[in-house]
Amino acid sequence: MKMRDTFLKPMHPEGRKFVGIFAAITVILFLIWSVLGWIGVGLTVWCYYFFRDPERVTPAREGLIVSPADGIVSMIEKSVPPAELGMPDQALTRISVFMSVFNCHVNRAPIAGRIAAIAYRPGKFFNASLDKASADNERNSLCIEMADGRQIAVVQIAGLVARRIVCFSSTGDTLRTGERFGLIRFGSRLDVYLPEGVEPMVDLGQTMIAGETVLADLQ
């Protein structure tokens, strides 16, 4: 029952064409050799699983910053937000969440607020778990401004396998905490830059659930 429930989660619309392509190839493989066909079935099921989009229960209390992605906390360090966002040139606490190809890759807003800026920058495709991925890899950055004027930066970073960053939101949009705003296909990383003076409430290696796990408390 538990395994069935895991694989029968709703699929994000971004995954439909990929599942369709895998399914079409599977039919062709069955015509060639049944063994190849069953391998295709397995890959099609995996593709469906990759693009799963389960509902999440986001904490209701205001001031809680939640994880924007499923995965593992790979880094916690001081760093300056991406220059293209136009935020102050000041080192802030950066929490990096690494997503493997087995994690759900739908990205969610870490806090409620208005998107003050979105900036895409092309780049390399180093392993997203490496520190240099923040500076060198393809990325899409968002600056979310909260009601009190403080800002949080969220950065979608492409990885070794991921070659497509998707962002559903636009500058000026208002997001709720835990609301879907994008995804990255096939392995990647999300960086969150906390406001000055806000301390992280997570540890290295800790498992994150997007929209649920609390990263920090503004209060």
Swiss-Prot record:
EC code: 4.1.1.65
Q: How is it modified after translation?
A: Is synthesized initially as an inactive proenzyme. Formation of the active enzyme involves a self-maturation process in which the active site pyruvoyl group is generated from an internal serine residue via an autocatalytic post-translational modification. Two non-identical subunits are generated from the proenzyme in this reaction, and the pyruvate is formed at the N-terminus of the alpha chain, which is derived from the carboxyl end of the proenzyme.
Modified sites of kind Pyruvic acid (Ser): S188
| Annotated positions for site Cleavage (non-hydrolytic) | G187, S188
| Pathway info | Phospholipid metabolism; phosphatidylethanolamine biosynthesis; phosphatidylethanolamine from CDP-diacylglycerol: step 2/2
What GO terms are given for molecular function? Answer: phosphatidylserine decarboxylase activity
CC annotations in GO? plasma membrane
Swiss-Prot/TrEMBL GO biological process terms:
phosphatidylethanolamine biosynthetic process
Q: Which cofactor does it need?
A: pyruvate
Localization recorded for this chain is: Cell membrane
Enzyme superclass (EC): lyase
Which keywords annotate this record?
A: Cell membrane, Decarboxylase, Lipid biosynthesis, Lipid metabolism, Lyase, Membrane, Phospholipid biosynthesis, Phospholipid metabolism, Plasmid, Pyruvate, Zymogen
Which reaction does this chain catalyze? a 1,2-diacyl-sn-glycero-3-phospho-L-serine + H(+) = a 1,2-diacyl-sn-glycero-3-phosphoethanolamine + CO2
Q: How does it sit in the membrane?
A: Peripheral membrane protein
- The keyword Membrane appears for this protein: yes
Instruction: Tell me, in a sentence or two, what this protein's role is.
Output: Catalyzes the formation of phosphatidylethanolamine (PtdEtn) from phosphatidylserine (PtdSer).
- Tell me which family the UniProt entry assigns to this protein: Belongs to the phosphatidylserine decarboxylase family. PSD-A subfamily.
Name of the protein:
Phosphatidylserine decarboxylase proenzyme
Gene source species? Ruegeria pomeroyi (strain ATCC 700808 / DSM 15171 / DSS-3) (Silicibacter pomeroyi)
Task: Output the lineage of the source organism.
Answer: Bacteria, Pseudomonadati, Pseudomonadota, Alphaproteobacteria, Rhodobacterales
